[in-house]
Swiss-Prot record:
Keywords: ATP-binding, Ligase, Nucleotide-binding, Protein biosynthesis. Its EC number is 6.3.5.-. Gene3D superfamilies: Glu-tRNAGln amidotransferase C subunit, N-terminal domain. Allows the formation of correctly charged Asn-tRNA(Asn) or Gln-tRNA(Gln) through the transamidation of misacylated Asp-tRNA(Asn) or Glu-tRNA(Gln) in organisms which lack either or both of asparaginyl-tRNA or glutaminyl-tRNA synthetases. The reaction takes place in the presence of glutamine and ATP through an activated phospho-Asp-tRNA(Asn) or phospho-Glu-tRNA(Gln). This is Aspartyl/glutamyl-tRNA(Asn/Gln) amidotransferase subunit C. One of its GO terms (molecular function) is asparaginyl-tRNA synthase (glutamine-hydrolyzing) activity. Belongs to the GatC family. The lineage of its organism: Bacteria, Pseudomonadati, Thermodesulfobacteriota, Desulfovibrionia, Desulfovibrionales.
Length: 94
């Protein structure tokens, strides 16, 4: 599937990425290769294949959730460059 540089530029703009022309061209080719591969996978006949959610037959082994208090709030806030009461102060992003 052919992806244009304009489509890649739109994706980059939405992702807040600044890409030069060379990268737009390279990524257009890479996206096209990925979509071609997805088309090839979609064409595989899976009629007699039983659905599964994991290639492993073993269930997930999880540990029990246990609450551990390692540090007090004051100890954590003492490591912060800036705090306000019980909150970390971080730079504004938007």
């Amino acid at each position: 599937m052919k992806i244009s540089k304009e489509q890649v530029a739109t994706i980059a703009r939405l992702a807040r990425l600044d890409l030069d022309e060379a990268r737009l061209e390279r990524f257009a080719g890479q996206f096209g290769d990925i979509l071609d591969y997805m088309d090839m996978l979609g064409a595989v006949d899976t009629t007699d294949v039983e659905p599964l959610y994991s290639p492993s037959e073993h269930g997930t082994v999880l540990r029990a959730d246990e609450v551990h208090t390692h540090c007090t709030r004051e100890e954590l806030l003492a490591n912060a460059p800036e705090s306000d009461g019980q909150f970390f102060v971080v730079p504004r992003i938007v």
